[in-house]
Design a protein with these regions (language model features):
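Short beta-strand segments
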Residues: 47-49, 106-108, 151, 165-167
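Conserved acidic residues
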Residues: 102, 147, 161
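Short, ordered loop/turn segments at secondary-structure junctions
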Residues: 24-27, 49-52, 85, 108-110
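Short, acidic/small-residue loops that bind anionic groups at enzyme active sites
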Residues: 123-148, 187-197
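Glycine-rich phosphate/diphosphate-binding loop of Rossmann-like nucleotide-binding domains
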Residues: 6-13, 34-85
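N-terminal small/polar loop signature for handling phosphorylated ligands or for N-terminal nucleophile
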Residues: 67-107, 111-129
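C-terminal binding/interaction regions
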Residues: 1-42, 54, 150-201
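Short amphipathic alpha-helical segments
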Residues: 58-60, 116-120, 177-178
Length: 201
């Protein structure tokens, strides 16, 4: 029943999906089994890449959903900024933010359009790539929409800042965050040498 609910929830409103005579006594494993909240606050920046949003022609919902998820996970402070799809502006801003923020997440510009410049701009700057993060995000998204395969998102470190590039749709951004959040929390615990279950003290 839980699998059915998980597969159907993107296609209807929650109140429209009713599964009767199903009782859950105990649940173990799955993403909810892993920690999704930081032990100590970590600074983060969320950059929304969109010509139309930057011009005020439509509101940003994807970036706001990422900010909300980070806030709930204990990231603080969080810098939020909207900018157009301009490579030079993005590169300069990210390099500036690496001086102050431990985690930098871009939203938008990971597709195959001519103005999707985020990946092409930031990938050459990555000093240590974390391919598994975006592999997890795409695998998670692919179970919900075939369009997840079109994302070219990358992740990795620039100096000591973790940079992650997410899709610009609200669904793509929020699902990617759901997929990578446990790993994201674990990464910053490890980076700060905090002991973790199963690791060496």
């Amino acid at each position: 029943a839980l699998t059915i609910y998980d597969m159907l929830k993107p296609h209807c409103e929650p109140h429209e999906l009713i599964i009767q005579q199903c009782k859950l006594d105990l649940k173990k494993g799955g993403k909810s089994h892993f920690k999704r909240h930081l032990r100590q606050p970590v600074s983060a920046a969320v950059l929304v890449l969109s010509d139309t949003v930057a011009a005020g022609r439509k509101p940003d919902t994807a970036g706001r959903s990422v900010v909300e998820t980070l806030t709930e996970a204990g990231f603080d402070p969080i810098h939020y900024q909207i900018l157009p799809d301009e490579a030079d502006q993005l590169k300069a801003l990210v390099l500036e933010l690496t001086q102050s923020y431990a985690c930098i997440i871009t939203v938008g510009g990971t597709g195959i359009g001519k103005r999707d410049i985020t990946v092409d701009t930031l990938e050459p700057l990555l000093e240590r790539e974390l391919n598994g993060l975006m592999e997890a995000a795409r695998a998670f998204g692919q179970k919900r929409t075939p369009y997840a395969a079109m994302s070219r998102g990358v992740a990795g470190f620039i100096d000591r800042s973790l940079v992650i590039t997410l899709p610009g749709s609200r669904g793509g951004a929020s699902e990617s965050m759901a997929a990578i959040l446990p790993a994201l929390v674990h990464i910053f615990d490890v980076c700060r040498d905090l002991p973790h279950p199963g690791g060496y003290e």
